[in-house]
Amino acid sequence: MNIQIITVGKLKEKYLVQGIAEYLKRLTAYAKVTIVEVPDEKAPEVLSDAEMKQVKDKEGVRILAKIPDDTHVIALAIDGKMKSSEEFAADLDKLATYGKSKVAFVIGGSLGLSESVLKRSDEQISFGRLTLPHQLMRLVLVEQVYRAFRIVRGEPYHK
C-alpha cells in the first residue's frame, strides 16, 4: 500500500519530527508512507470569514495539486466520522483488499480544509472532538496508521 500524508505547512518542532521519523521507520515493514508538505498561506492573526475562506482555498489548490487521480482520499476534518483504532484498522485493510493501493490522508492548516478538498475526499474522519494543532496531528496520524497495521496482522502493540 502507498500512503501519502498531505499536510499544510513545514514542521519545525524537533520532538515532532523525531516522533514522526520513528513511526515512518516502523511503517516501512508494512507500507510505503510519504509525507508531502504544501506551503501554508501567510495571513494576519485576525481574519474575516471571507479572508479565512480565501486562505483555505489557496491552501486547497496546493493540496489538490498533490493528489493523483487514482488515489482514495481521507480528509481529517473536525466534522468527520470518529472511529476506534480497530475500526480504522479494518477500514484500511478493506481499502487494500479491494484494490485501493493508493491512499492519501489530508491534514489542513490551522484554519482547516477548503470545501474543494472536502468535496474531493472519499471520506472524512476525525480523531475526536478535541482540537489539536495540525502539526501534532501528523504524529497522531502516523502512530494510528502504524497501530492499524499491527492490529490487522494480529501483532503485539495494540492494548
Curated annotation (Swiss-Prot):
EC number(s) on file: 2.1.1.177
Pfam families (UniProt xref): SPOUT_MTase (PF02590)
Homology family: Belongs to the RNA methyltransferase RlmH family.
Subunit text: Homodimer.
GO molecular function: rRNA (pseudouridine-N3-)-methyltransferase activity
Binding-site positions, S-adenosyl-L-methionine: 76, 108, 127-132
Compartment(s) of residence: Cytoplasm
HAMAP family hit by this protein: 23SrRNA_methyltr_H
Function noted in UniProt: Specifically methylates the pseudouridine at position 1915 (m3Psi1915) in 23S rRNA.
Catalytic activity, reaction form: pseudouridine(1915) in 23S rRNA + S-adenosyl-L-methionine = N(3)-methylpseudouridine(1915) in 23S rRNA + S-adenosyl-L-homocysteine + H(+)
Main location as per UniProt: cytoplasm
Name of this chain's protein: Ribosomal RNA large subunit methyltransferase H
Highest taxon, organism lineage: Bacteria
Origin species: Listeria welshimeri serovar 6b (strain ATCC 35897 / DSM 20650 / CCUG 15529 / CIP 8149 / NCTC 11857 / SLCC 5334 / V8)
